[in-house]
Structure formats: C-alpha cells, structure tokens
Amino acid sequence: MSEATALSPAEFEQALRAKGAYYHIYHPFHVAMYEGRATREQIQGWVANRFYYQVNIPLKDAAILANCPDREIRREWIQRLLDHDGAPGEDGGIEAWLRLGQAVGLDPDQLRSQELVLPGVRFAVDAYVNFARRANWQEAASSSLTELFAPQIHQSRLDSWPQHYPWIDPAGYEYFRTRLGQARRDVEHGLAITLQHYTTYEGQQRMLEILQFKLDILWSMLDAMSMAYELNRPPYHSVTDQRVWHKGITL
C-alpha cells in the first residue's frame, strides 16, 4: 500500500488557513460582544478570564525556548516573551491588558488575584502550557498558528467596541492595536517553521490536529464563559452563589 502524498507547501498552508472556520471569532459569546449585545458583566468576565491566558502565554513561549536547540530560532522567538512581559524598563502586553481591565471597570489587583478565573478557562489554558512543555519545540511553536486569524479578531474589537460600548475607556484598546502588528509578524515566523518542519503527509495531518487542539482550547474557554455569564450557570450555581472553585494549585 503506497503512502499518501504530502501536500505541497502552498496546499498545506491553505489547509492550515482553512481551520480559520473554527476560530473563536465565530463563537456565540464573541459574536454577541462584536454585535453590541454583551452586558457589562459579560465583558468584564471575558477580560478577567482572558487575563489568565495572557499571563500564561510567556510561560508557553518560555517552554518552547527551553526545548529549542536552534539559536537563531530562539533569538527570534524570544521577542514574544518581551511582547507580553515587557523589556526591562518597559511595559508589555500584560500591563496593557491590566489597563483594558481598568477600562472596563475592573480593579487590577482583582485581575492579578485570578479570583474570577473560571475552572473551565483555567483547565483549557493549563492544557496549552503543558502541551508546550511536553511536545517537541516545532510542534509547540506551530500550535501558536491560531495567530493566522488573530488580526481579524483584534480589528473586529477595535471596529465595534467603541461604537457599542461607550462606557469603556478608549485607552484600554491599546492591547488590540499593538497586537495587530505583533500577530502579523509572529505569523510569518511560525508559518515558516511549520512549512519547513512538516513535509510528510502524516506529519501534516498531525499538525492540523495540533492546530485543532489549539482552536478547541480557545472555543472551550468561551464555552465556560458562556455558561457563567450568558446562561447564569457558573460552577456550583445549583448549590451556592459564591465563587467556591479553586483559584489555582501550586505544584
């Protein structure tokens, strides 16, 4: 039985981009935010829970760096850490997200405490970081390729939120504006690594599954938020109105 023929680089890239049909921009929770149907509580809940994702992205990127023996790749990939953590003496994406939190009426200390992070969101983000730690560096790096679709989602927020939510301080949109350029730059690097590494049919199919795994993470995060903030069914809602869920277990 002959082996399946590998996709050409152009065909493989097209298959990767086709996964954009499952990007979380199409999740009902995000659609509601884009269309102006989200409440203040729902937007605050989204900002608070996405903060957990933001603070873990540098850990994901640090894991990739730790597993990567290629000096030139490390030199370029480390920029992602600086984008989020900030270079010495400079703010990064995490501080920009804290300012977004303030813009929607959240206290920075409450965001940092992670007390609002839903278990479903925590589990999804932790799964992503653990994957990056355990996978080979090429697979972990290419799992970031949901960035292919990120500029569209950042632009959609910049286009719609000021119109629909005048109560949000416009200064909070700095994160989205900054990420527009950073995401496009990161896509070029991540896509180059991916197209170079996956040259067999089996490898390409595995990469498509890895990208779907990342899409599942982003979608599942919004599922958890939808349960809590749209359906008013947060964890343990049937037995208490208190946030009794765990706030993170340090190992």
Swiss-Prot record:
SUPFAM superfamilies reported for this sequence: Heme oxygenase-like
One Pfam family, short name: TENA_THI-4
Span of the signal peptide: none
Entry superkingdom: Bacteria
Metabolic or biological pathway, per its Swiss-Prot or TrEMBL entry: Cofactor biosynthesis; pyrroloquinoline quinone biosynthesis
Keyword Oxidoreductase: yes
Gene Ontology biological-process annotations: pyrroloquinoline quinone biosynthetic process; sulfur compound metabolic process
One term of GO molecular function: pyrroloquinoline-quinone synthase activity
Record keywords: Oxidoreductase, PQQ biosynthesis
Catalytic activity: 6-(2-amino-2-carboxyethyl)-7,8-dioxo-1,2,3,4,7,8-hexahydroquinoline-2,4-dicarboxylate + 3 O2 = pyrroloquinoline quinone + 2 H2O2 + 2 H2O + H(+)
Keyword Oxidoreductase (UniProt): yes
Coiled coil: none
Stated family: Belongs to the PqqC family.
Name used for this protein in its record: Pyrroloquinoline-quinone synthase
